[in-house]
Amino acid sequence: MLQGILETVPSDLKDPISLWFKQDRNPKTIEEVTALCKKSDWNELHKRFDSRIQFGTAGLRSQMQAGFSRMNTLVVIQASQGLATYVRQQFPDNLVAVVGHDHRFHSKEFARATAAAFLLKGFKVHYLNPDHEFVHTPLVPFAVDKLKASVGVMITASHNPKMDNGYKVYYSNGCQIIPPHDHAISDSIDANLEPWANVWDFDDVLNKALKQGKLMYSREEMLKLYLEEVSKNLVEINPLKLEVKAKPWFVYTPMHGVGFDIFSTIVKKTLCLVEGKDYLCVPEQQNPDPSFPTVGFPNPEEKGALDIGINLAEKHDIDLLVANDPDADRFSVAVKDMQSGEWRQLTGNEIGFLFAFYEYQKYKSMDKEFQHVHPLAMLNSTVSSQMIKKMAEIEGFHYEDTLTGFKWIGNRAILLEKKGYYVPFGFEEAIGYMFPAMEHDKDGISASIVFLQAYCKWKIDHNLDPLNVLENGFKKYGVFKEYNGYYVVPNPTVTKDIFDYIRNVYTPEGASYPSSIGEEIEVLYYRDLTTGYQSDTINHKPTLPVDPTSQMITVSARPSNGSENEHIRFTIRGSGTEPKLKVYIEACANEEQRASFLAKLTWNVLRREWFRPDEMNIVTKF
């Protein structure tokens, strides 16, 4: 039958499709490819077979479909074989792996296939998902740390749409992988594409390993330890002080994800908060549901994603909503403005400042000897707000920025800790918050615990809500306002063309960078991490890692007609996984209206001078 099908396949597709039929043993994906061949849907087959899904620092992520460029059981097996082989070479005396999964379609199957590959390579596997249980993503890096494993894999696509899934990798230090490991793992995957003997029989492999003591179901052990670590490291307020009102005082939504069970358990056992009495959970979004029925895009940042929760809060006269994304590694907040009566969802940068301010307050109350031995340090990604940099300058603590992603934030935090710094917090503007006392990756559950305490402390001790605290921060450190968005590009070559235009056409001949952008913006600082140039360093070498394969430029500037204390900073970069050119703009001024104006002005000037959407056929999105 297959031979007859292959006879109809175009020559440039015949080899990869033949290989697929040879290697795949999943009846559903075999039938999927067969059906596409019978329909002669060569365009779709080219999309799925012309290239192989690339393993990067975020692991793998794509739609769940048949094909070498998609997420499916065969691709997961191949990735796991390559990863297990590489890690075995790096840690031959510590063959211990952690595997977990969320509630998405096929997550359990992918996780079991992953565990089987590691078991066949001689690893002991701590499997976090007995039966039909789910775990939140932060439990995997936490377990890697506590179990001293050499690698961890979490099957999740975080807040992506329902048709997606992913394969997230943590290295032996509990952080996401960074170069050169990502490239080496990718090479190892390419060298281990042929499925190993018995790897497709993953249920049998797991059952045999369980009897031999090589497969351990470690979910309950790790959850117990996670709870203990939250209590020890993150809880500092007397739970009795959380009796803010005699009725529920906040709403929680897990966004159809895995968050509710772990959230409700943690807040009850550490903060004595009980659902129904102290808070309400959005009933329509409470249970894990991989179809995400109430939201098309299950990301708390998306417009309208929190509407159901806000409506519930309004109904019960509640003025605080906290949210996790589906795998509970991100955290978001909406608060009711008591002056206007309108609800306001805080940006990732605003929440980041509130956490940083709270952690700074805690640090200042610590023992002076501890402060002397362990100076304070906080960090965020280079596309995130510079407000904590300003706070660090004024308050006298150490601040650093990193490349985008917690793979960089987490690894840098570890290095700072080794130097003796106390690093309580790091963040990224995409609602990701890291508390290194728990793990060196973002954690939405830890963020929830810390934020609820901060909220109560400010409310009870100072009669301030988060908006008041933010306003006080603006008064002391300057008003910081962002204007972020992206352009949808038709293909990666357009992104390169735009950056080449900036470097080679817009920049005057003989200059390293443009001194101005239009008549409105005066450039003060310029960094190009693609070419390896930074304007304010010796020999103009960047302080952050250079990557010639990705496009990224950061500019600090001032408005040409502005005052000395007005400042603009923006980063433009090409997305490594999506057809997007991302733009992150932040302006600082004395007044909120002026800062917002400068941020939007910068967007418009860049649009006109650099991006030229009509000419380049790119579309604006926010």
From Swiss-Prot:
Cofactor: Mg(2+)
UniProt cofactor note: Binds 1 Mg(2+) ion per subunit.
Disruption phenotype: Hyperaccumulates ribose 1-phosphate and upstream purines upon glucose-induced purine nucleoside recycling.
Catalytic residues as annotated in Swiss-Prot or TrEMBL: 158
InterPro entries the record matches: A-D-PHexomutase_a/b/a-I, A-D-PHexomutase_a/b/a-I/II/III, A-D-PHexomutase_a/b/a-II, A-D-PHexomutase_a/b/a-III, A-D-PHexomutase_C_sf, A-D-PHexomutase_CS
Tagged with keyword Metal-binding: yes
Modified residues annotated as Phosphoserine in this record: 158
Binding site for Mg(2+): 158, 325, 327, 329
Catalytic activity from the UniProt record: alpha-D-ribose 1-phosphate = D-ribose 5-phosphate
Catalytic class of the enzyme: isomerase
GO CC terms, sorted: cytoplasm; nucleus
Keywords: Carbohydrate metabolism, Cytoplasm, Glucose metabolism, Isomerase, Magnesium, Metal-binding, Nucleus, Phosphoprotein
Protein localization: Cytoplasm; Nucleus
Major localisation: cytoplasm
The protein's Enzyme Commission number: 5.4.2.7
Binding-site residues for substrate, renumbered to this chain: 57, 61, 158-159, 168, 329-330, 404, 428-430, 442
GO biological process: glucose metabolic process; guanosine catabolic process; inosine catabolic process; purine ribonucleoside salvage
One of the record's GO molecular function terms: magnesium ion binding
Domain of life of the organism encoding this protein: Eukaryota
Known role: Major phosphoribomutase that converts ribose 1-phosphate to ribose 5-phosphate. Involved in ribose salvage via the pentose phosphate pathway.
Family: Belongs to the phosphohexose mutase family.
Misc. remarks from the entry: Present with 4960 molecules/cell in log phase SD medium.
Name of protein: Phosphoribomutase
Gene name tied to this protein: PRM15
